Amino acid sequence: SWISGSEASGNYLELSAEEIELLQNLKALKDNGTFKNIIVLINSSNAIELDFLNPEICGEDYGIDAAMWIGDVGQTGINGVGQLLAGTVTPSGSLVDTYLYDNLANPAMYNFYTQAYPNAAEYNLLTEGADVQGMYSVYQEGIYLGYRYFETRYEDVVMGTAKAGDYDWATTVAYPFGYGDSYTSFAYSNFNVTESDDAFTVTLKVTNTGKTYSGKETVQVYFQSPYTDYDKANGIEKAAAELCGFAKTDVLAPGASEDVTITVKKSELRTYDANNAKTYILDAGDYYFTAATDSHNAVNNILAAKGYTVAGTNGRMTEDGDTSLVWK
């Protein structure tokens, strides 16, 4: 259970020295044949740093074979974890945060600090052991937080947008928003979007392409709205991809399929103009919808629809997207 971190750095979202030593000792036992595999369970509601899962990032191989985020499961929920590890139940969840190798890569960290009130000492508010009330925190953010920042900057880098800076998504993001793994595999087909007066209806077919395990699949729908000259002139913030709907299939046996329908209200596509119109606006231009497995997959699909490829961007794009899962 995640309650501590590094005392040296004060970062409670990184491994402590004791936890690193534990992994090192487990690696030694694995190497001498005491057991075969090391599986890390992340029992935390916070998005901890995951550099220790990638030897190329952290500089040391701890011999970790798998990791599973289980959240704060409590006394009862832990019983279900055993079923997941044994394979009697197949995982079907999706991450609600972007997990980083280094949480300082989050730009909000640079707008977040703690300050003492100037007269705190006068009222004995900073005395050690007292009920400390002499500090306050200053925090600032816009929409460019979490996946909206990491995926938007990634798209800017891929497209060669001015002032995108030196940014490498693959060495920054460990697991993107919406990521989820399974003991089986799924394929999407027959993707289609229809428009009505006040909504878009997204339909697609999901097929369990595995041969052994049954499982559920979480289908995510993202959209991208046009980023216009008006938006830029008026300080309107837009992300490269926005989650606008999701649905989960029933348990699908190997080879089985299910048609999934997700409805997106047109009001979801609006953007708030705080500086000029003082209300929500809907820009003219190209809107993209895509079905994706996570936020990064969504942006790659949209980039592919715009004509971008891994080869054509000198590797700035991490993987080729699927244009069959994009509607414009």
Annotated model-derived regions:
Residues 1-328:
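C-terminal non-catalytic regions of proteins with extracellular/luminal or membrane-system context
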